[in-house]
Amino acid sequence: MIKKTVFSLAILASSAFAHSAIMNCFDNGDGTITCEGGFSDGSSASGVYFIIEQNGKEIFGTKMNENSEVTFKKPNGDFRAILDAGEGHEVYIKSKDITQ
């Protein structure tokens, strides 16, 4: 009985981490940034909320398109891009980490 319980808990714990949110952003070199999102299990981030935050305030918000992408005008100064797929499934990328 104990072995079955431990095995069941291990299966449940592994499935809880089966789909971590992932995102990559790159500078297009034309004054815009493109961010691509998804999940570690290969599922789409289409429709997932995306935010640009600057100085602790949301300056842009939208949802990932059907290709799990968002392209936006590059803000002046430091900012961070946030993929918000719900509690425990957020990804934060600082502007200094976005390269061309």
For the regions a protein language model found, what residue spans apply to each?
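Sec-dependent N-terminal signal peptides
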Residues: 5-13
